[in-house]
């Protein structure tokens, strides 16, 4: 019910850097309580495994809008909302790698 995921890319700089790790929970209780500002991991059908911040939720339409920190981030501004079905889990712990 937990998964360790390595951060790849720059979508949540400076908080989450390439090479860091995040512990993701797949426990349904936590997934039902996702809210704006949470960090989630999802498996996008085109872009693959992604980590983003929740910008907006519309549960009755099965929509989660996600956003990255930099303006150039590929996120819901590019591909629209994601479905709850592609959600891998919610980040519950961030492991920063010393630089």
Placement of each model-derived feature along the sequence:
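Extended hydrophobic leader/signal-anchor segments used for secretion and membrane insertion
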Residues: 1-99
């Amino acid at each position: 019910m937990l998964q360790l995921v390595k951060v790849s890319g720059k979508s949540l700089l400076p908080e989450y850097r390439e090479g860091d790790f995040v512990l993701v929970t797949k426990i349904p209780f936590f997934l039902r309580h996702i809210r704006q500002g949470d960090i989630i991991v999802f498996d996008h059908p085109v872009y693959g495994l992604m980590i983003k911040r929740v910008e907006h939720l519309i549960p009755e339409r099965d929509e989660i809008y996600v956003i990255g920190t930099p303006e150039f981030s590929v996120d819901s501004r590019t591909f629209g909302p994601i479905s709850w079905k592609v959600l891998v889990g919610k980040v519950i712990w961030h492991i920063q790698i010393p630089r």
